[in-house]
A protein has these predicted regions:
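Extracellular and organelle-lumenal recognition/adhesion modules and their flexible linkers in secreted
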Residues: 20-174
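N-terminal carbohydrate-binding accessory modules
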Residues: 163-222
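The substrate-binding groove and active-site-proximal loops of carbohydrate-active enzymes
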Residues: 206-213, 235-258, 322-342, 443-461, ...
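A short, well-structured beta->alpha microelement
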Residues: 212-218, 655-674
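Aromatic-lined substrate-binding rim segments of carbohydrate-active enzymes
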Residues: 217-315, 348-352, 466-473, 688
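Polysaccharide-binding and catalytic clefts of secreted carbohydrate-active enzymes
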Residues: 290-501, 505-506, 511-514, 521-524, ...
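Hydrophobic targeting/anchoring helices
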Residues: 476, 481-653, 740-750, 755-773, ...
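A conserved amphipathic helix/loop scaffold
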Residues: 571, 684-911
Length: 911
C-alpha cells in the first residue's frame, strides 16, 4: 500500500456524526506497550518499540467527497524523540482497509508538553470507500497525551486570507532629494576583526547588524531600531525582470538604473540616517541564454533545465514565460559570469556617481535557484547534481588543470589511462549510481568527489568574483553579502566555506528553518549555520528572518511557513529565534518583508524593537561575558561524497534542547591555531577526517580536563576509509561492519552511569516516521561493532544486544562514542557537559540559548531557570531596565512562549 502525505492547516469543518464508537480503541503493535484511561482521554506509550494506535469512531462517507478530520490533543509528558501522527484510514463496506493517508513525517515530532495542539488532515473518499476512520498513532520515545475533541466532516474550503497592506513610503520630489543627497558624505562600511571575531563598521562606528529587507516600511522599521535597509526589488535586477520589478538592462550594452535611484531616494526620505545594502539580482535573461545555449543547465539526456520564478521545475524542451519560466543555467560558466560582471560594473559605477549612492554601504548578491545560488535540484540521488552543459565541462576542465597540472596526474587520480585535461568530463549517471557513497581513492571515487567539489568551489569563486568587481568599481569600502550553506543545512553547491572566505564576500546569511521548527511548539529554526566557523574566518553571520505575521497574505500550500495567529505567537517565534542567533555568536539579522506590510503594526514593531535592542546589547557585551565551553564540529564535505549519507544538521534539535549553546564549527577548524579551548567537544559524523585532523583532536580535545563525543560514522569517506583506525587512536576497539545492526540505539536502562541519568528511550531526536503499525528511523548506511571490553555500554542497537553507545574513561580522559547518525540526545549532551566540568546554563528539555550577553528561552517543558557560575546583572530587553542580579534567573513564560533577558557581569566582577 502506498502512503500519501498531506497536511492542510486552513480548513473549514462541516461536522458529521460517527456511525458507531469503538469498544476497544487502543491497539499496540510491534512491541509497543501502553495504558489508556478512557475517563479522561489520557493515552500513554510506555516504551520505545512499535506503535500505539488510538482509533476514533468510523464515519460514513460518500465516494468522491472530500472530508477533513481535526483532533485536539496535548502532550502531558514526553521524552524528546517522541512522535504523534494523525492518519485517516479508508474502509470498504466490510470494514477492510483500502487506503490510508498520514500527516507529513516532519510534523510528527512532538517537542512541547502542556501545549494544546490541533492536528488536521483531509482526504478525498475514493471509489469503494464506505467509511473513514481517524487514528492517532504514537511512536518513538515514551509520551503521554490527553486526547480531546475529534471532529470530522465534509471539507468546506475557506478563502485564503488576502493580507493587510499599507501604503509604501512615498517618493519625494526627485530633483530636490538628489540635491539634498549630494550634500552627504559618501558612506563606507567594512569588516574589522576584534577579539577573534568579525565586526561591522559603518562610517567608522561599530554597529550591530539590524536590518529590514523590503520595499514598504523603511520609516517605521528605522524608527524602531533598524540601521540597515537591504533592498528587495526596486530596480536591483540586472537582466531578468518581472512584471513587478523590471530589469535595468536597456539593450545594446546600456543600463537604466533610474528605478534603483528612485528607491534610494524613498529610503533617504523615510529615514535620512539609514544605510543601504543593494540587492543585486544576477540572473541572465532568456534572450541571452537562447543566444548562448551552451550555458543552459543540461541533464545526461541533453534536456534543458527549466526554472519557474526562483524554483526549479524540472527538465523540458520549452518554457512559458507568462508563468515566469526561464532556462536554468550553469553558475560555473565563464560566459555567464562575464555577462553578469558587465551589469555589476555598470551598477557600481552608476551608484558611485549618483548622489543617491551616498547612502549605499554594500551589495547583496542574489541569483539562481531560490535566489541564493543553491544547486538546481535540492536533492539528486539519481544524477548527483551533474551538469552536462558544455560551459560546465569547460569550467571543470580548467579547474582540473589547476588541481592536477598534468595529464598523467589526472590519469592516476581518476584511474583512467585515456583521460586528458582537455577531454575530462563530468561523471555519468551510471557511475554515480554505482555506489551509495564515494571516498577519495583513485578511480571513480576521486572522479565523483572532484566533480562535486568543483560544483561548490566554482559557486564560491563566482560569488567572490562578483563581490570583488563591485568593490573595485564602487570605488570605496563596502561590504558584500550573500547566502551560504553549512553542514547544518547542506546544499551541494555551497560547501566550500574556506574558498568563500578568501576575499570578496564579507557577510553570509541563512534563512531560518520553516515549519515545524518555527512553530510555537518547536525549539526554533534560526542559528542554523556553523556560526563559529564564520567568525573564525572573519565572515559576519546574519540571519534571514522572513517570519510571517497576522497581516501576511496566505498563499496556498505554504503551511510550512508557520503563520502566527497573532502578536503573542509572533513574539514567541522571533524572541526565540533572534535570541538564538545572538547567543550563538551571530552579528544580527534582517526581517524580510517579502510581500510588504508584514510588520506595519504597533504590536509587531514593539516586538521587533526588542530584538534590535538585544542585538545592540550583544554587540556591546559579547567580549565581556563568559563564553561557551562546548564546541560542535560538523564535516562540511560529507555531502560531496554522497547524497544524504550523514547529516550533522539532523542533530540540531537535540542541541537546541540540551540546555547549552555550543560554538558550531567545520571539521577543518580543528586545525586553526585561533580555535579557542573548550571542555566538551562533539564531532558529528567526521566521515572525511584526515590524519592531521585526528592528531589535532587528540592534542587539543582529548585532554584530562575535557570530554570528547563522536556521533555517527567516522573516517569512512576520507583517507582512512574506515572507522576502526579513527577510534583506535582514542584507545577504543571497534570493527567496521558492512551494515548496522539496527538504525537506532536505545539507552540501556539497567546501566547506572552519570551520563545516562534521566536518559531513556532512543538516542537522538529526529528520524522517526510513524507508518501504519511501526516506525521508520533515520537510515544508518554504515555500521561498527564495538568490541572494547573496557568500555561501559550505555546503549544498545534496538532489538539486539549489540553495544551502540559507549563511554571509555582511561587515564583521566573520556570518550563517548556511537556509530548512530545524529546519535545524541539533549539529556545526554547535558550530562556530558556536567562530566566535563561545565555548569549547563539550563537543564535539558526547553529551547534555551545563552551567550554573548543574551539569554533566551522558549518553554517546551518545565519552567526555565538560567544559571551562571558568577554573579550577573539582568536587564529587560523591552525597557532596558535592570530586573535583578545573581547567579540564577527564572524566565517566566508559559508553554510555547519565549522570553529573553540581557545579562552582564556584576560590577564588582567585570573584566
Amino acid at each position: 500500500m502506498k502512503y500519501r502525505f498531506l497536511f492542510f492547516p486552513l480548513m473549514g469543518l462541516c461536522l458529521a456524526e460517527p456511525l458507531f464508537c469503538m469498544e476497544s480503541p487502543v491497539v499496540d503493535t510491534n512491541g509497543s506497550r501502553s495504558s489508556f484511561d478512557a475517563s479522561n482521554g489520557i493515552l500513554s506509550k510506555l516504551n520505545l518499540p512499535g506503535v500505539t494506535t488510538w482509533r476514533a469512531s468510523k464515519y460514513k462517507v460518500s465516494p468522491g467527497q472530500e472530508y477533513e478530520a481535526a483532533l485536539e490533543f496535548s502532550c502531558e509528558e514526553l521524552i524528546p524523540g517522541a512522535a504523534a501522527s494523525l492518519q485517516l484510514v479508508s474502509l470498504d463496506a466490510s470494514g477492510r482497509e483500502i487506503g490510508r493517508i498520514a500527516d507529513p513525517a516532519r510534523f510528527q515530532q512532538v517537542y512541547a508538553e502542556n501545549l494544546p495542539q490541533k492536528l488536521k488532515l483531509r482526504v478525498k473518499a475514493g471509489t469503494g470507500t464506505a467509511f473513514i476512520q481517524p487514528e492517532l498513532k504514537l511512536g518513538g520515545n515514551p509520551l503521554k497525551v490527553r486526547i480531546g475533541r475529534m471532529t470530522f466532516g465534509k471539507y468546506v474550503p475557506k478563502p485564503l486570507f488576502k493580507g493587510i497592506y499599507g501604503e509604501k513610503d512615498p517618493m519625494p520630489p526627485r530633483v530636490f532629494a538628489l540635491k539634498d543627497m549630494a550634500k552627504l558624505k559618501a558612506s563606507e562600511s567594512w569588516i574589522a576583526r576584534e577579539a577573534g571575531r568579525p565586526v561591522l563598521y559603518i562610517n567608522g562606528k561599530k554597529n550591530a547588524y539590524k536590518a529590514y529587507k523590503g520595499g514598504t516600511d523603511y520609516r517605521l522599521m528605522c524608527e524602531n531600531g533598524a540601521n540597515i535597509i537591504v533592498t528587495h526589488g526596486g530596480g536591483g535586477a540586472l537582466y531578468w525582470g518581472k512584471e513587478w520589478d523590471k530589469q535595468a538592462y536597456a539593450g545594446n550594452g546600456k543600463f537604466d538604473f533610474k528605478r534603483l535611484e528612485d528607491n534610494l531616494l524613498r529610503i533617504y526620505a523615510a529615514n535620512p540616517d539609514a544605510k543601504v545594502i543593494v540587492t543585486v539580482e544576477c540572473d541572465p535573461d532568456n534572450a541571452w541564454l537562447e543566444a548562448h545555449p551552451e550555458n543552459i543547465y543540461l541533464n545526461e539526456k541533453g534536456e534543458r533545465g527549466v526554472a519557474r520564478y526562483t524554483g526549479f521545475k524540472g527538465f523540458g524542451s520549452s518554457i512559458n514565460q507568462k508563468k515566469q519560466e526561464r532556462w536554468a543555467w550553469t553558475y560555473a560558466s565563464e560566459a555567464y559570469q562575464r555577462h553578469v560582471i558587465q551589469g555589476l560594473k555598470a551598477m557600481a559605477e552608476f551608484l558611485k556617481q549618483s548622489p543617491a549612492g551616498n547612502i549605499v554601504i554594500g551589495f547583496c548578491l542574489a541569483g539562481g535557484h531560490d535566489g541564493q545560488y543553491v544547486q538546481w535540484r535540492y536533492g539528486d540521488e539519481t544524477a548527483g547534481h551533474a551538469d552536462y552543459s558544455e560551459s560546465f565541462q569547460a569550467a571543470l576542465r580548467k579547474w582540473l588543470k589547476e588541481k592536477y597540472g598534468t595529464d598523467e596526474a589526472l590519469r592516476r587520480a581518476w584511474n583512467d589511462p585515456e583521460i586528458t585535461l582537455d577531454t575530462a568530463r563530468v561523471f555519468t549517471g551510471k557511475e554515480w549510481r554505482s555506489k551509495p557513497y564515494f571516498d577519495t581513492e583513485p578511480g571513480i571515487d576521486r572522479k565523483i568527489t572532484d566533480c562535486r567539489t568543483f560544483l561548490s568551489v566554482s559557486t564560491a569563486r563566482m560569488l567572490r568574483k562578483f563581490g570583488n568587481v563591485l568593490k573595485e568599481y564602487f570605488g570605496r569600502r563596502c561590504v558584500i553579502q550573500t547566502w551560504y550553506s553549512s553542514p547544518v543545512w547542506r546544499q551541494t553547491s555551497r560547501l566550500a566555506a574556506e574558498e568563500l572566505a578568501k576575499g570578496g564576500i564579507d557577510i553570509v546569511a541563512q534563512v531560518t528553518d520553516y515549519a515545524p521548527p518555527r512553530l510555537a511548539r518547536a525549539p526554533g529554526g534560526s542559528a542554523n549555520y556553523t556560526i563559529a566557523d564564520s567568525n573564525l574566518h572573519n565572515l559576519l553571520y546574519v540571519q534571514e528572518m522572513d517570519h510571517r505575521t497576522w497581516r501576511t497574505q496566505e498563499v496556498g500550500g505554504w503551511n510550512y511557513t508557520a503563520y502566527p495567529s497573532g502578536p503573542a505567537e509572533f513574539r514567541s517565534q522571533v524572541i526565540r529565534d533572534a535570541g538564538s542567533v545572538l547567543a550563538a555568536g551571530g552579528s544580527g539579522f534582517y526581517y524580510y518583508d517579502m510581500f510588504g506590510s508584514w510588520y506595519h503594526d504597533p504590536e509587531a514593531l514593539k516586538i521587533i524593537r526588542e530584538t534590535y535592542r538585544m542585538a545592540d546589547w550583544a554587540e556591546q557585551k559579547r567580549n565581556q561575558v563568559p563564553r561557551t565551553e562546548f564546541a560542535v564540529f560538523m564535516d562540511e564535505r560529507d555531502r560531496l561524497h554522497g547524497e544524504g549519507i550523514a547529516n550533522g544538521g539532523s542533530a540540531m534539535k537535540s542541541l537546541r534542547m540540551s540546555g547549552l549553546t555550543p560554538d558550531i564549527y567545520m571539521l577543518d577548524d580543528i586545525l586553526n591555531p585561533e580555535l579557542p579551548e573548550y571542555k566538551l567537544y562533539l564531532f558529528f559524523s567526521p566521515m572525511t577526517i584526515t590524519r592531521e585532523q585526528l592528531n589535532a583532536i587528540l592534542e587539543k580535545a582529548y585532554r584530562k580536563d575535557a570530554v570528547v563525543m563522536i556521533a555517527g560514522p567516522a573516517g569512512v569517506c576520507g583517507p582512512f576509509r574506515s572507522a576502526e583506525p579513527v577510534l583506535k587512536a582514542f584507545g577504543l576497539q571497534i570493527q567496521d561492519s558492512m551494515k548496522p545492526f539496527s538504525n537506532v540505539v536505545a539507552f540501556d536502562e539497567t546501566v547506572k552511569d552519570p551520563l545516562t541519568e534521566r536518559c531513556t528511550g532512543r538516542l537522538g531526536t529526529l528520524g522517526v516516521t510513524i507508518r501504519k503499525d511501526d516506525v521508520a528511523w533515520l537510515r544508518n548506511p554504515f555500521g561498527a561493532k564495538i568490541t572494547d571490553a573496557a568500555a561501559i555500554v550505555l546503549g544498545r542497537w534496538l532489538g539486539t544486544s549489540e553495544p551502540g553507545l559507549v563511554v571509555k574513561r582511561s587515564e583521566g580522559r573520556t570518550l563517548i562514542y556511537t556509530p548512530q547518525i545524529a546519535g545524541v540526545s539533549a539529556q545526554l549532551i547535558n550530562n556530558a557537559a556536567k562530566e566535563a566540568g561545565i555548569l549547563p546554563p539550563s537543564e535539558a528539555g526547553n529551547a534555551v540559548y545563552v551567550g554573548n550577553g543574551i539569554a533566551a528561552g522558549h518553554r517546551l517543558a518545565d519552567p526555565i531557570v538560567i544559571r551562571f557560575r558568577e554573579d550577573m546583572n539582568f536587564y529587560d530587553p523591552a525597557t532596558g531596565e535592570k530586573s535583578g542580579s545573581g547567579r540564577e534567573i527564572r524566565l517566566d513564560c508559559k508553554p510555547g512562549e519565549s522570553r529573553a533577558v540581557l545579562y552582564e557581569r556584576a560590577v564588582s566582577q567585570k573584566k
